């Protein structure tokens, strides 16, 4: 199971970490994903859901 939101498709983003000398090093920003139990097609499943999807009411916990 990849760490991707089952509702919105949000996932980790990549970019650069910059030092004081402006040297660039690759790094990742992870999405705020929570593993929650939700009802999908009448079945209770445990999936990764972004905090934004939970707060906006796009999905409801079981």
From Swiss-Prot:
Similarity section: Belongs to the bacterial ribosomal protein bL28 family.
MF terms (GO), sorted A to Z: structural constituent of ribosome
PANTHER family, per database record: 50S RIBOSOMAL PROTEIN L28, LARGE RIBOSOMAL SUBUNIT PROTEIN BL28A
Domain of life (superkingdom): Bacteria
Keywords associated with the record: Ribonucleoprotein, Ribosomal protein
One GO BP annotation of this record: translation
Region described as Disordered: 1-28
Any one annotated GO CC term: ribosome
InterPro entries assigned: Bacterial_rp_bL28, Ribosomal_bL28, Ribosomal_bL28/bL31-like_sf, Ribosomal_bL28_bact-type, Ribosomal_bL28_sf
Keyword Transmembrane helix: no
Signal peptide location: none
Keyword Coiled coil: no
Name used for this protein in its record: Large ribosomal subunit protein bL28
Gene that encodes the chain: rpmB
Cysteines engaged in disulfide bonds, as pairs: none
């Amino acid at each position: 199971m990849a760490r991707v939101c089952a509702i919105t498709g949000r996932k980790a983003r990549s970019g650069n970490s910059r030092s004081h000398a402006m040297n660039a090093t690759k790094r990742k920003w992870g999405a705020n994903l929570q593993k929650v139990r939700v009802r999908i097609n009448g079945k209770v499943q445990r999936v990764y859901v972004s905090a934004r999807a939970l707060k906006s009411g796009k999905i409801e916990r079981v």
